[in-house]
Amino acid sequence: MPRSRINENFIDKTFSIVANILLRIIPTTSGEKRAFTYYRDGMSAQSEGNYAEALQNYYEAMRLEIDPYDRSYILYNIGLIHTSNGEHTKALEYYFRALERNPFLPQAFNNMAVICHYRGEQAIRQGDSEVAESWFNQAAEYWKQAIALTPGNYIEAQNWLKITGRFE
């Protein structure tokens, strides 16, 4: 049974109903409809913590989806799963790929910054301040990009940039 038919969550049900209506009334190819169905099912599985199932759906959506903008969100969600699983190198790769297709994803820049900041903190714990500084500088660059896209967001990042003297 497709995942879209087993959702119990009210928001997921509402999203599924609206998505199904839109799929019927907006002129799209059958491939686009199938890609969206896999994407929707991937989001549903991801929200429930079923990451393996979500990845299967996202990979299938990637195979079918041709629009770069839509692909960017699929790649971004794959990055989120790898982040949640602690697979930071893979996550960064997917965030980069998402940004190649859509450079206006502040959340991807933010997530990349968070990973770099985390790695900087790890380097400090290991006693390597030079490596830590490099990671922190990279985090700062990503946060600046996220903030440039959405100036009212990422207040904690803005504060960190100011406190550490990285805000220009």
Curated annotation (Swiss-Prot):
Subcellular location: Plastid, Chloroplast thylakoid membrane
Membrane topology: Peripheral membrane protein
Pfam families: TPR_1 (PF00515)
Cysteines engaged in disulfide bonds, as pairs: none
Domain of life: Eukaryota
Keywords, comma-separated and alphabetical: Chloroplast, Membrane, Photosynthesis, Plastid, Repeat, Thylakoid, TPR repeat
GO CC list: chloroplast thylakoid membrane
GO biological process, one term: photosystem I assembly
Main localization of the protein described in the UniProt heading: plastid
TPR repeat windows: 35-68, 72-105, 120-153
Matching PROSITE patterns: TPR (PS50005), TPR_REGION (PS50293)
NCBIfam families according to UniProt: PRK02603.1
Function: Essential for the assembly of the photosystem I (PSI) complex. May act as a chaperone-like factor to guide the assembly of the PSI subunits.
Homology family: Belongs to the Ycf3 family.
PANTHER family assigned to the protein according to its UniProt record, in alphabetical order: CELLULOSE SYNTHASE OPERON PROTEIN C, TPR REPEAT-CONTAINING PROTEIN MJ0263
Protein name: Photosystem I assembly protein Ycf3
Organism: Glycine max (Soybean)
Lineage: Eukaryota, Viridiplantae, Streptophyta, Embryophyta, Tracheophyta
